[in-house]
């Protein structure tokens, strides 16, 4: 569902970008564009943060080298038992 919402945001942002280049935007459209961009960035950051929090990193020898800060977040969310 979040993916569909992101696609809708991107589509509308692109429509407004095209219109801005071709003929310019009204004041309401400028406000809408700013709002859509903020919503997009918020959702992107949430998604990226979630991906990083779920990540475990291993070196070539198979030893986990996940940064301690990420491990702490994972522990707080109950994603780790160590």
UniProtKB/Swiss-Prot annotation:
Cellular localisation: Cytoplasm
Alphabetical keyword list: Cytoplasm
Stretch forming the signal peptide: none
Broad class of where this protein is predominantly found: cytoplasm
Coiled-coil zones: none
GO cellular component: cytoplasm
One Pfam family this sequence matches: DUF896
Family: Belongs to the UPF0291 family.
Protein name: UPF0291 protein PEPE_0871
Organism for this UniProt entry: Pediococcus pentosaceus (strain ATCC 25745 / CCUG 21536 / LMG 10740 / 183-1w)
